[in-house]
Amino acid sequence: MGKQPVKLKAVVYALSPFQQKIMTGLWKDLPEKIHHKVSENWISTILLVAPVVGTYSYAQYFKEQEKLEHRF
C-alpha cells in the first residue's frame, strides 16, 4: 500500500474592493521626497547631463558651420 497524493487547494490572494489603499504611501509627502532625492543626487545629475548637453550643442554647432561652409 502506497501513499495516495492529496489534492491541495490553491491559495488565492485578492484585494477587497473596499480596502484598496495600496498606493497611498507613494503620494504621501511627495514634494519632500523629491526635494530629498534632488538635494542628495545633484552632483550625479550634473555629471550625467553636462556631457550630454555639451555633445549635443557641439554637434549642432558643427552641423551649422558645415552648412554655412557649403553656402557659397
From Swiss-Prot:
It comes from the Eukaryota. Its main location: mitochondrion. It is a single-pass membrane protein. Residues 1-41 are mitochondrial matrix. Gene3D superfamilies: Cytochrome b-c1 complex subunit 8 (1.20.5.210). GO terms for biological process: mitochondrial electron transport, ubiquinol to cytochrome c. The keyword Mitochondrion applies. Residues 59-72 are mitochondrial intermembrane. The chain crosses the membrane at residues 42-58. Keywords: Electron transport, Membrane, Mitochondrion, Mitochondrion inner membrane, Respiratory chain, Transmembrane, Transmembrane helix, Transport, Ubiquinone. InterPro entries: Cyt_b-c1_8-plants, Cyt_bc1_su8_sf. It is found in: Mitochondrion inner membrane. GO terms for cellular component: mitochondrial inner membrane; plasma membrane; respiratory chain complex III. Pfam families: Cyt_b-c1_8 (PF10890). Component of the ubiquinol-cytochrome c oxidoreductase (cytochrome b-c1 complex, complex III, CIII), a multisubunit enzyme composed of 10 subunits. The complex is composed of 3 respiratory subunits cytochrome b (MT-CYB), cytochrome c1 (CYC1-1 or CYC1-2) and Rieske protein (UCR1-1 or UCR1-2), 2 core protein subunits MPPalpha1 (or MPPalpha2) and MPPB, and 5 low-molecular weight protein subunits QCR7-1 (or QCR7-2), UCRQ-1 (or UCRQ-2), QCR9, UCRY and probably QCR6-1 (or QCR6-2). PANTHER family: CYTOCHROME B-C1 COMPLEX SUBUNIT 8 (PTHR34559), CYTOCHROME B-C1 COMPLEX SUBUNIT 8-2, MITOCHONDRIAL (PTHR34559:SF2). Component of the ubiquinol-cytochrome c oxidoreductase, a multisubunit transmembrane complex that is part of the mitochondrial electron transport chain which drives oxidative phosphorylation. Belongs to the UQCRQ/QCR8 family. This is Cytochrome b-c1 complex subunit 8-2, mitochondrial. The lineage of its organism: Eukaryota, Viridiplantae, Streptophyta, Embryophyta, Tracheophyta. The gene is UCRQ-2.
